């Protein structure tokens, strides 16, 4: 499966790092294309960065009465970790993200340790899982309002073939009043990945924030990116 993407190349000179960020259900890459401008306005990061915002394919989504919408995998029941899950679609999207990582490394000569993957909601779920399954070490992972709908499958795959990113920095952020992906579901997801052995995962709580990214959370994300890009 190949997908299109919004690409915002580094300004002025060759990129030294890359951020690949996956949107949530029903959104598009364009929905997060403002992120580079926010990073620039912060004046915290000087190194040039390639930004890639992939577009999920339009697929029939069960909670949308079967009508097609942009989605990284089908959802049968919103926010329920025990519901039926689209395991096949989920792992297909993980493979797509792997392809974008390799593209940045092979085509643009970005060091793997300077590549950060991430996403919001569905995109966060894919990013966390992909990090667990990679056989190459990368720079970091950002998971905003994320979850893990394939808990058993991730555990089984990881135990059979542990990845190499067990000490890779992971930023997970979640609002306490998220009505879509419950805060506790996000917290359980962080505990799952910690149990798998990801010792450099930090779960960040944002009081009063719903299913969105607050200014405080985004400021923390920029600092996280800076620490990886400029180390």
Swiss-Prot record:
Enzyme's top EC category: hydrolase
InterPro entries documented for this protein: AB_hydrolase_fold (IPR029058), LYPA1-2/EST-like (IPR050565), PLipase/COase/thioEstase (IPR003140)
Pfam family, one: Abhydrolase_2
Organism (species): Candida albicans (strain SC5314 / ATCC MYA-2876)
Catalysed reactions, semicolon-separated: S-hexadecanoyl-L-cysteinyl-[protein] + H2O = L-cysteinyl-[protein] + hexadecanoate + H(+)
GO cellular component: cytoplasm; nucleus
Gene3D superfamilies given in the database record: alpha/beta hydrolase
Compartmental location: Cytoplasm; Nucleus
Protein name according to UniProt: Acyl-protein thioesterase 1
Function statement: Hydrolyzes fatty acids from S-acylated cysteine residues in proteins with a strong preference for palmitoylated G-alpha proteins over other acyl substrates. Mediates the deacylation of G-alpha proteins such as GPA1 in vivo, but has weak or no activity toward palmitoylated Ras proteins. Has weak lysophospholipase activity in vitro; however such activity may not exist in vivo.
The organism's place on the tree of life at top rank: Eukaryota
Its EC number(s): 3.1.2.-, 3.1.2.22
GO biological process: fatty acid metabolic process
Molecular-function GO term, any one: palmitoyl-(protein) hydrolase activity
């Amino acid at each position: 499966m190949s997908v299109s993407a919004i690409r915002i190349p580094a300004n002025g000179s060759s990129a030294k790092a890359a951020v690949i960020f996956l949107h949530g259900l029903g959104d598009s890459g364009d929905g997060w294309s403002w992120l580079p401008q926010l990073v620039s306005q912060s004046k915290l990061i000087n190194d040039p960065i390639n930004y890639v915002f992939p577009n999920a394919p339009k697929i029939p989504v069960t909670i949308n009465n079967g009508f097609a919408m942009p989605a990284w995998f089908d959802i049968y029941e919103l926010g329920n970790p025990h519901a039926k899950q689209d395991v096949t679609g989920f792992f297909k999207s993980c493979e797509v993200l792997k392809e974008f990582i390799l593209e940045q490394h092979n085509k643009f000569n970005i060091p793997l340790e300077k590549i950060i993957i991430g996403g919001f909601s569905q995109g966060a779920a894919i990013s966390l899982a992909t990090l667990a399954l990679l056989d190459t070490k990368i720079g970091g992972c950002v998971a905003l309002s994320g979850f893990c709908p394939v808990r058993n499958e991730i555990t089984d795959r990881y135990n059979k073939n542990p990845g190499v990113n067990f000490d890779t920095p992971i930023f997970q952020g979640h609002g306490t009043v998220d009505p879509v992906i419950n805060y506790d579901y996000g917290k359980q997801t962080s505990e799952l990945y910690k149990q798998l052995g990801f010792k450099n995962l930090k779960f960040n709580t944002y009081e009063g924030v719903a299913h969105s990214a607050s200014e405080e959370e985004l400021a923390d994300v920029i600092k996280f990116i800076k620490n990886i890009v400029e180390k």
